[in-house]
């Protein structure tokens, strides 16, 4: 199972969410699409990657729909 999460300028709650998902289903694959959040948010995405979350980054904000399309294309 792949769980797709679009993210723009996330906070630590995204890290907690990923942890909770992993606790519920250790086999779930989490995919986060960073929709151009910028360098300020690199520590959050780095923490997610350390925890085994797959990160795909848009260089600029393209909107939630574009982030979802990117994630769906990757998942196929």
Region locations from a protein language model:
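Short beta-strand/turn micro-motifs composed of small residues
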Residues: 5-7, 34
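Short glycine-/acidic-enriched loop or helix-start segments at secondary-structure transitions
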Residues: 14-15, 41-43, 67
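Short, well-formed alpha-helical segments that are part of the catalytic scaffolds
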Residues: 9-24
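Donor nucleotide-sugar binding loop of glycosyltransferases
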Residues: 10-13, 37, 64
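Cell-envelope/extracellular polymer assembly enzymes that use nucleotide-activated donors
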Residues: 1-2, 29
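Conserved donor nucleotide-binding strand/loop of the catalytic core
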Residues: 45-74
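Amphipathic, non-transmembrane alpha-helical secondary structure
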Residues: 15-19, 29, 69, 73
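A conserved acidic beta->alpha catalytic loop
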Residues: 34-42
């Amino acid at each position: 199972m792949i769980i797709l999460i679009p993210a723009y300028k996330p906070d630590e709650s995204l890290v907690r969410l990923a942890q909770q998902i992993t606790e519920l289903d250790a086999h779930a694959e989490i995919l986060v699409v960073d929709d151009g959040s910028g360098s300020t948010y690199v520590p959050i995405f780095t923490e997610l990657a350390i925890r085994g979350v797959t990160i795909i980054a848009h260089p600029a904000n393209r909107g939630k729909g574009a982030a979802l399309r990117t994630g769906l294309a990757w998942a196929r």
